[in-house]
Curated annotation (Swiss-Prot):
It is found in: Nucleus speckle. Induction: Not regulated by vernalization. The gene is FRI. Belongs to the Frigida family. Residues 474-484 have a biased composition (Basic and acidic residues). Residues 60-97, 409-440 form a coiled coil. Residues 594-609 have a biased composition (Polar residues). This is Protein FRIGIDA. Keywords: Coiled coil, Developmental protein, Differentiation, Flowering, Nucleus. Changing residue 146 to E: In strain: cv. Edi-0. GO terms for biological process: cell differentiation; flower development.
Length: 609
């Protein structure tokens, strides 16, 4: 026992020593009032130092906490709505694929065919399956578009419309009534269209792959105009929603102006902007001409039923019609009158009569000013277009010209102007043909005069060529410059006149047998002897040397006319044109003559012996 230390026995315990326990409790009692006193004094100091009571701070903290709770609650509600929309989308997808929810519930209970472990599991199964059986009849009776509008799910509504865009008649009956189920229809519609208007004009063409997506947005805007029932008030739109829609309309117009103006916009593009301002209001920077261009380019006859219900656009139509008439756009103004159903305010007969009077006066002025058939034709064509547009407008709206426009005889005027136009075309064609003949004659005369003034060789100077065509290539396929340094194209030209190459030696012109000595005081150089020979009269191989009597053209610096001896019997005289080709230039003869005068001994080797 001595090996173990007395640890447990040596330590005093509170149960074994009651005096020690009493001492500790008394000590705690003494210390407790001190702590309370310090805390109270610190609270007194803080309250004394602060300007407001402590309970006001507590109220502020509670207010901040309530704001945080409200924010959390709002986010939680949004999340819950999003989850519900996902569940509804899944259910609708299953229904479209032919899957019945009851069958799905049966499959859900299929694993429970095994005996349950206890009664609790059975009760849990019943409570889980019961709500699903109650929801099925509610979702099955409500249309898909209505559920999406009730849930304010813009993406779900767009997907539903996109999937059924081919059946627009059904959608136009379903979507306007479905929008009434939305809590805030104006905000919901603005969220549905998004910011597709910022895309370029190519996205609004019929060939664009995004054309169907653009049609979805236009259908939602048109449905929003058709949503309220007739005579039951107007749709309430918040001010901030109007401001957001106005910003979108201004950005849309700005893009169209940069792409060529509203008058050059695509049909779908113009229709979208027109429906947007008809739904949410016309911005202040929109002019009457802008609205007129949008109505003209959008095919407003197709959406006339929706435009007539616009609380923002209909009051402005009267001013737009009047301004259009003042600008001479009577036909466009009349189309707008019929689009918005304002026939009681603007008479078609008065509008068309004013238009015909104005066009007739303009046509008479143009005829008086016309100084040529072309100007008269332009005036007649313009008047014909005016009358044709009037007839087309009356046929479109089923108006009788005899009743609405008595005394004008529009059809007879159209026939007369067409005849005048055809007659003018014939006269202008005949005049153009005569002018072309005169121009051709003048051109031929000018070319003939130029040919006369151009120097040419006479037939005696330039006889016909023996060969079919001139070619400086010899029989051995070599060019003159390749055979000898002194031979050139002139030698080939001479050979074409003198005959075949078998009778004419193509050798160096400096060969001794071709050189003829000149008289004393001549040019100081030899002249080739074959210049005046017949084709078959010379052959160096036979040993004949025929000399040419040459009279120097320059003797002691004086120029004399060239003298040629008559041809020898059996020889052909070389034409004078070829002789001129081989004649030396005057500058060269002058140079050679001066050299002979200064050094008479330089040509002593050429003197005849």
């Amino acid at each position: 026992m001595s090996n173990y230390p007395p640890t447990v026995a040596a330590q005093p315990t509170t149960t074994a020593n009651p005096l020690l326990q009493r001492h500790q409790s008394e000590q705690r009692r003494r210390e407790l009032p001190k702590i309370v006193e310090t805390e109270s004094t610190s609270m007194d100091i803080t309250i004394g130092q602060s300007k407001q009571p402590q309970f006001l701070k507590s109220i502020d903290e509670l207010a901040a906490f309530s704001v945080a709770v409200e924010t959390f609650k709002r986010q939680f509600d949004d999340l819950q709505k999003h989850i519900e929309s996902i569940e509804n989308a899944i259910d609708s997808k299953l229904e479209s694929n032919g899957v019945v929810l009851a069958a799905r519930n049966n499959n859900f209970h299929q694993p429970m065919l095994s005996p349950p472990r206890n009664n609790v599991s059975v009760e849990t199964t019943v409570t889980v399956s019961q709500p699903s059986q109650e929801i099925v009849p509610e979702t099955s009776n409500k249309p898909e578009g209505g559920r999406m509008c009730e849930l304010m799910c813009s993406k779900g509504l767009r997907k539903y419309i996109y999937a059924n865009i081919s059946d627009q008649a059904k959608l136009m009956e379903e979507i306007p009534s479905a929008l009434k189920l939305a809590k805030e229809p104006a905000k919901f519609v603005l969220d549905c269209i998004g910011k597709f208007y910022l895309q370029g004009r190519r996205a609004f063409t019929k060939e664009s792959p995004m054309s169907s997506a653009r049609q979805v947005s236009l259908l939602i805007l048109e449905s929003f105009l058709l949503m309220p029932d007739r005579g039951k008030g107007k749709v309430k739109i918040e001010s901030w929603i109007k401001d957001e829609a106005e910003t979108a309309a201004v950005a849309w117009r700005k893009r169209l102006m940069t792409e060529g103006g509203l008058a050059a916009a695509e049909k779908m593009d113009a229709r979208g902007l027109l429906l947007l301002v008809a739904c949410f209001g016309v911005p202040s920077n929109f002019r009457s001409t802008d609205l007129l261009d949008l109505i003209r380019m959008s095919g407003s006859n197709e959406i006339a039923g929706a435009l007539k219900r616009s609380q923002f656009l209909v009051p402005m139509v009267s001013g737009i019609v009047e301004s259009s008439i003042k600008r001479g756009m009577h036909i466009e103004a009349l189309e707008m009158v019929y689009t918005f159903g304002m026939e009681d305010k603007f008479s078609a007969a008065l509008v068309l009569t004013s238009f015909l009077k104005m066009s007739k006066e303009s046509f008479e002025r143009a005829k008086r000013k016309a100084q040529s058939p072309l100007a008269f034709k332009e005036a007649a064509t313009k008047q014909l277009a005016v009358l044709s547009s009037v007839m087309q407008c009356m046929e479109t709206h089923k108006l009788d010209p005899a009743k609405e426009l008595p005394g004008w005889q529009i059809k007879e005027q159209i026939v007369s102007l067409e005849k005048d136009t055809l007659q003018l075309d014939k006269e202008m064609e005949e005049k153009a043909r005569s002018l072309s003949l005169m121009e051709e004659a003048a051109l031929a005369k000018r070319m003939y005069n130029q040919q006369i003034k151009r120097p040419r060789l006479s037939p005696m100077e330039m006889p016909p060529v023996t060969s079919s065509s001139y070619s400086p290539i010899y029989r051995d396929r070599s060019f003159p410059s390749q055979r000898d340094d002194d031979q050139d194209e002139i030698s080939a030209l001479v050979s074409s006149y003198l005959g075949p190459s078998t009778s004419f030696p193509h050798r160096s012109r400096r060969s001794p047998e071709y050189m003829v000595p000149l008289p004393h005081g001549g040019l100081g150089r030899s002249v080739y002897a074959y210049e005046h020979l017949a084709p078959n009269s010379y052959s160096p191989g036979h040993g004949h040397r025929l000399h040419r009597q040459y009279s120097p053209s320059l003797v002691h610096g004086q120029r004399h006319p060239l003298q040629y001896s008559p041809p020898i019997h059996g020889q052909q005289q070389l034409p004078y044109g070829i002789q001129r080709v081989y004649r030396h230039s005057p500058s060269e003869e002058r140079y050679l003559g001066l050299s002979n005068q200064r050094s008479p001994r330089s040509n002593s080797s050429l003197d005849p012996k």
